[in-house]
Amino acid sequence: MNSIIKRYKVERKDIAYLRYTIESYDGAAVVVTEDPAIAIIRLMISPLCENIVDELISSFVQDESLNIQEI
């Protein structure tokens, strides 16, 4: 199975928090910082976990008011 790749523009201060939280969902996704200077992250998502990761990203935006934009 191939990973689903999604890229996001986030706030730099949130990168570590996002990585820690997303990767705590064992096997759901791996977070890579593509460009720390402009805070671009790449998620490599397990196809079976895409809905979980999408819901998690939505929760970050709605419940925690994080600025996350898919690019």
List where the protein language model places each region.
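Absolute protein N-terminus
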Residues: 1-2, 71
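Short hinge/gating elements
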Residues: 3-7
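Amphipathic, hydrophobic secondary-structure cores in small proteins
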Residues: 8-53
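C-terminal structural segments of small proteins and small subunits
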Residues: 42-71
